[in-house]
Amino acid sequence: MTVSDSGPRMQSGPTSERHAPSQDDGSSESYAPSQDDGTTGSRTLSLDDGDLHVCQDGPRDAPALLLVHGSASSLRSWDAMVPLLAGRHHVIRIDLLGHGRSGKPDDRSYATPDQARRVGEALDRLGIEHAVVAGHSSGGVVATALAELRPGLVDALALINTGPSLEAYIPQEPLPLDPSRWPPTDDQILRFGRTAFSRPDFEVPQELVDEVRLMTFHTLTTTMRETTEYLKERALPDRLAGLGKPLLVLFGADDGRWRPSSAAGYRKVPGVTVELLPGLGHTPILEDPQRTAALLLDFTTRRR
C-alpha cells in the first residue's frame, strides 16, 4: 500500500515482544493453491450493495479463521498459507469489494467500516458465529474495524505487517498511473509491489499480478484513500485497547513500507504478543508462509 499526505495511492494483560527465529527451508517462495479435497469451496455472495467472492477450505466444523487481504491485492495472496492452516481451521477468505473476483461498482462506499460491515454480513450468510480474524497490511485495518463493529463475532485478531498509524509509514516513490490507460502493465504493477518484499528478486506470483489488473482505477485509488482516512481518525492500538480481544502482531523486520519499530506501538493493547520476523519484509504470508502459519497456529491454539 502506498501512502502519501493525500492518502494511499499509486499516484493520482502483560505484553510481550520477541524476535521470532529465522528459518530457511528453501520453500519460502512456494505458492501452492489449495487443493480440492472435498473441503474446498468457492462461491459468490450477493449482498445488497455488491457481490463478494468467497473461498472456504478445511473442515466446516473446525474453528473459523478469516483471512483478510490488503490493498491492491486479493484473497489469492493467502494461497500459500491455506494448506498449512486448513488442517486445523475452517479457513475463510473474502475478496473485499473492489478487489479480486468481487464486484467493483463505482457507486458504492469503500470506506473501511463499510468494507468491514460487508465482511460481517458475508460471515452471517455462511453461518459463522465466531471467528479468529487475521489481516495482512491494510487487511488488518479492516479486521480492526470488524472487531469494532461486531465484537461478538470476532474472538481474536492477528495483524500481519499492519502499520499502527500513519506516522509509521515509510514514504514511497509515487507511481503515476493514467486512468485513460487502464489497466496497468505487469511492469507497473511489479514496480508498485517491489517494496512489499525484503528481497528485490522475489518472484511475485503471476496470479496476484493478474488479480490487481482486475481492479478498476476508481476502486484501487478509493480503497487506498479510505484506509488512510480510517488511520487518520484514530490509531489502531487506540481502537484495539478497549476491545478486550486477544491480539497477535507479526511484523517483518525488514518491512520497507511501515517502520518495523512501530510494532511496539501495539504494546498498549492489554495481553498483546508482538513477533518481529527477521529476514522478512512487508509480506511474510508470501515470503515465508511456513513460519508465518506456524506462529498464527500457535496463537489460535493457545487461545482455545
Model-derived segments and spans:
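Conserved HGGG/HGGXW glycine-rich cap/lid loop of the alpha/beta-hydrolase fold
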Residues: G50-R101
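Long, intrinsically disordered low-complexity tandem-repeat segments
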Residues: S16-Q35
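Conserved loop-alpha-helix segment in the C-terminal half of the alpha/beta-hydrolase fold
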Residues: P83, L247-L280, L286, R291
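N-terminal cap/lid segment of alpha/beta-hydrolase-fold proteins
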Residues: D36-D51
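Flexible "cap/lid" loop of the alpha/beta hydrolase fold
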Residues: T144-L149, D155-T185
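Active-site loop/oxyanion-hole signature of alpha/beta-hydrolase fold enzymes
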Residues: G50, C55, I92-S138, A294
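Conserved alpha/beta-hydrolase catalytic His-Asp/Glu region
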Residues: A168-I170, T185-G242
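Conserved catalytic-core motifs of eukaryotic protein kinase domains, centered on the activation segment
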Residues: S77-D79, S102-R108, Y169-I170, P260-S261
